[in-house]
């Protein structure tokens, strides 16, 4: 690595040395020597030494069954430690040259202040945009987090230790104690099972999400709001109100039942109880501290009236509130455990906590104790506004076909025919008639099938809660207006007393292209306009559209869908909230946050940002308070910049170019993935797709249809499999064909102009550059040589040739003629991990060969080592699905 990353390199070396000592103590010198030999060969191979590459393959293939597991674990642990060091480096005091050297939010506010002072930006517009800033981060349980929570907790403490080591005033014995603690944590992690032995339940996943909030975001959000307010005051001379709350959290964990039969109505109720229990427990801890701190006696009349004639009115109010909170915590704890309890459910509304806290705050201000008011008390108010009574609201998601099945059974029971066989106009007419009717539709004596009853039970759970509990009801695979109206009718039939926003999820190429027509049909209806409170939520699917059409075509379809929806919303005078269902990988829409937001159509963030944070990306972006603070700054700065300094409207010719790229790339992608009869057998042989099912990643099954082929495979295992063999195919297949067609028709100058002036197109190329830097043809070829039958090998040769040509073409479009020249941090990050990921790939090939051979089967150490290579490669790639 270059000298500018010396601090990072030093931490990586330190952790690596201590891991080496752990391996020696646990496995013996011989295993450590073998690991060091493999590491040296891998580094030499990365430098271009072909002989050492061949030796590396030979050494790894010659490992005995007894050596497989410790060697695989060694490289897996090193990659996890490298990730700890890298994540810490982003917030290290020595990071003066990384991608985060300056607070991106501060830089944005400075730019806005300059433009406002120069008359380029209207002050009122600036203040209004700030007041409407809204960022909703949606934590999802997509099974891409492969690291066990117990290991993650040790890694969090390791990061704290690295921070302690940076202190310049450490005494020698203090430094020695820190190093000893690091050694203990590394040893603890080594002697802990790397792999979950059972799949997490939906409740387990929800607990994991709540733990991220408890350990990181609970601390980061008040800091963010405090610093944000200070920066706004300093740079823009604006005072933000104390109830200013631009950050909100939502969860899919326990609410996303699309394709997951384990998320039942009962599970959703249990998860809601868990969320309220944990939130109140955290508030209880804050109230305990406040009751110690707020010992003052000077108080406002408002507080005295609330406290009575108490000598210490603040303590009186806080202690009363604390006791109510703790009693509710006891009640919920017993309920979760199915135990009886005398404790009562006292706190059921957030205002029961917020009101007395606000009274205390106002009293302190009135009594000239602002410095006290702006301490923990203000932090608690910020938490109440951001986390509410359940830490995160819950989204409910279900496939559109499940709602159709409800009405299909019901209409057949009522003698009206089969709803699923009706024309779209007939469905809409039926649904709107029932929505406008005052009588119930569902007969009390009707006994639906268990599948339909489960859907109805979910709506009953929604109806039993208040409107602060849920975020959205999301309809996956939404295609028509009737899909949305069907959910509205089910909400009505359940007796839901509030207007829960319903969002269609447009996720295939055709559905994205037709999305604005669906919303137009809905907005043409008076009943619907009256139902939505002038706000329309639409979710844009990135994963399935990329799997359906390839990354280039999907990216353009997403852009056009958003652009048309923005224009429609402006024309109809409604607020549009676009919800981005991005994954961590390029193949599922992933990109650095600021880059992704700047590349969206102008006006697409006026309604705020709502975006999924999935799997391992939650840990990478929010796992530590300092890192979470940085991520919140990036999001806030990017949203403000996009709304106040929007990207340019693309020229008509640029749209023509993208339409051509989209059409040509999609056709080529589908010709390979859908129409080449050799593709599916090749995919199954060249990747560990079949073996991935043994890895207990998440509660949701890997396939929508267990007997189906690639088309039924979920986007996550589809991406995971290709990232394992380093071909990274879903993220680039078709790009070469599309770009070549554009070059032939429009010339290189046009594409270079687009790259320079249009953030959307530039982001497409930068995402390709990142993928190409992670892809590796020699490793893909090695998988093919060892695992693929001869008749299917030519396809692999063709794909690797296409990859090489695509890399060359994208490099030629870069001003520096090299990959990631403008993203040196990402380039260094990949280079840091490659020498440790490569051996795991080579080892995985050998393990797959042994596991698939009829003699060995896949048992014991081979099975364990194979799963460890999967988790290790995922750590090396820094994303899985």
From Swiss-Prot:
It catalyses: oxaloacetate + phosphate = phosphoenolpyruvate + hydrogencarbonate. Keywords: Carbon dioxide fixation, Lyase, Magnesium. It holds the Pfam family PEPcase. The active site is at 142, 547. GO terms for molecular function: magnesium ion binding; phosphoenolpyruvate carboxylase activity. GO terms for cellular component: cytosol. Its cofactor is Mg(2+). Belongs to the PEPCase type 1 family. This is Phosphoenolpyruvate carboxylase.
């Amino acid at each position: 690595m270059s000298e500018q990353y010396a601090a990072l390199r030093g931490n990586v070396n330190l952790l690596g040395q201590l891991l080496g000592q752990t391996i020696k103590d646990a496995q013996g010198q011989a295993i450590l020597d073998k690991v060091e030999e493999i590491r040296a060969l891998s580094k030499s191979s990365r430098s271009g030494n072909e002989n050492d590459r061949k030796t590396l393959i030979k050494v790894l293939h010659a490992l005995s069954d007894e050596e497989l597991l410790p060697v695989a674990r060694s490289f897996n642990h090193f990659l996890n430690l490298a990730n700890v060091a890298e994540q810490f480096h982003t917030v290290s005091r020595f990071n003066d040259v990384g991608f985060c050297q300056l607070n991106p939010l501060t830089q944005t506010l400075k730019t806005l202040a300059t433009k406002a002072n120069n008359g380029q930006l209207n002050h009122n517009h600036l203040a209004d945009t700030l007041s409407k800033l809204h960022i909703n981060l949606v934590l999802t349980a997509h099974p891409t987090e492969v690291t066990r929570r117990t290991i993650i907790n040790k890694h969090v403490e390791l990061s704290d230790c690295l921070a302690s080591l940076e202190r310049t005033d450490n005494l020698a014995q203090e430094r020695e104690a820190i190093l000893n603690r690091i050694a203990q944590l590394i040893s603890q992690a080594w002697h802990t099972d790397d792999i979950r032995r059972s799949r997490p339940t939906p409740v387990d996943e929800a607990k994991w999400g709540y733990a991220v909030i408890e350990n990181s975001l609970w601390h980061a959000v008040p800091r963010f709001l405090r610093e944000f307010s200070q920066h706004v005051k300093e740079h823009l001379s604006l005072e933000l109100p104390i109830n200013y709350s631009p950050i909100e959290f939502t969860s899919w964990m326990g609410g996303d039942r699309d394709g997951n039969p384990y998320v039942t109505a009962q599970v959703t109720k249990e998860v809601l109880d868990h969320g309220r229990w944990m939130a109140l427990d955290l508030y209880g801890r804050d109230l305990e501290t406040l009751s110690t701190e707020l010992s003052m006696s000077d108080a406002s009349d408002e507080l005295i009236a609330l406290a009575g004639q108490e000598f210490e009115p603040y303590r009186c109010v806080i202690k009363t509130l604390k006791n109510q909170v703790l009693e509710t915590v006891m009640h919920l704890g017993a309920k979760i455990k199915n135990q009886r309890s005398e404790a009562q459910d006292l706190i059921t509304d957030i205002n029961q906590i917020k009101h007395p806290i606000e009274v205390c705050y106002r009293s302190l201000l009135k009594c000239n104790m602002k410095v006290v008011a702006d301490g923990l008390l203000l932090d608690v108010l910020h938490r109440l506004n951001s986390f509410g009574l359940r830490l995160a609201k819950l989204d409910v998601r279900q496939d559109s076909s499940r709602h159709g099945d409800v009405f299909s059974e019901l209409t057949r029971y009522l003698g009206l025919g089969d709803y699923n066989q009706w024309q779209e106009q007939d469905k809409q007419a039926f649904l709107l008639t029932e929505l406008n009717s005052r009588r119930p539709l569902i007969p009390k004596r009707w006994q639906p099938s268990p599948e339909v009853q489960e859907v109805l039970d979910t709506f009953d759970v929604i109806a039993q809660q208040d409107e602060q509990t849920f975020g959205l009801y999301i309809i996956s695979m939404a295609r028509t207006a009737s899909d949305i109206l069907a959910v509205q009718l089910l909400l009505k039939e359940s007796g839901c007393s509030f207007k829960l926003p319903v969002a269609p999820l447009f996720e295939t190429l055709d559905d994205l292209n037709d999305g604005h027509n669906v919303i137009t049909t809905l907005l043409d209806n008076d009943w619907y306009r009256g139902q939505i409170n002038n706000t329309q939520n639409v979710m844009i699917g990135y994963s399935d559209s990329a799997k359906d059409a390839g990354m280039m075509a999907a990216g353009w379809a997403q852009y056009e869908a958003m652009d048309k929806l923005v224009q429609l919303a402006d024309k109809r005078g409604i607020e549009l909230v676009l919800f981005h269902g991005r994954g961590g990988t390029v193949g599922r829409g992933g990109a650095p946050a600021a880059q992704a937001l700047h590349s969206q159509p102008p006006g697409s963030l006026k309604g705020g940002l709502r975006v999924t944070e999935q799997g391992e990306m939650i840990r990478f972006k929010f796992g530590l308070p300092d890192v979470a603070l940085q991520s919140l700054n990036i999001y806030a700065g990017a949203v403000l910049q996009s709304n106040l300094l929007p990207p340019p409207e693309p020229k008509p010719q640029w749209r023509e170019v993208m339409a051509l790229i989209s059409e040509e790339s999609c056709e080529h992608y589908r010709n390979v993935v859908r129409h080449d009869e050799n593709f599916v057998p090749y995919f199954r042989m060249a990747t560990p797709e079949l073996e991935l099912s043994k890895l207990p990643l998440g509660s949701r099954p890997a396939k929508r249809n267990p007997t189906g082929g690639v088309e039924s495979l979920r986007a996550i295992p589809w991406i995971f499999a290709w990232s394992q063999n380093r071909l990274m195919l879903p993220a680039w297949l078709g790009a070469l064909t599309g770009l070549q067609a554009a070059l032939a028709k429009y010339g290189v100058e046009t594409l270079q102009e687009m790259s320079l002036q249009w953030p959307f197109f530039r982001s497409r190329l930068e995402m390709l550059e990142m993928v190409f830097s992670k892809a590796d043809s020699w490793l893909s070829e090695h998988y093919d040589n060892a695992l693929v039958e001869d008749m299917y090998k030519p396809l692999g040769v063709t794909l690797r040739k296409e990859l090489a040509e695509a890399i060359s073409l994208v490099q030629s479009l870069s001003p520096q003629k090299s990959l990631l020249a403008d993203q040196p941090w990402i380039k260094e990050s990949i280079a840091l991990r490659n020498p440790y990921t490569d051996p795991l790939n080579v080892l995985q090939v050998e393990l797959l060969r042994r596991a698939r051979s009829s003699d060995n089967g896949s048992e014991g150490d081979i099975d364990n080592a194979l799963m460890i290579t999967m988790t290790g490669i995922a750590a090396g790639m820094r994303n899985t699905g």
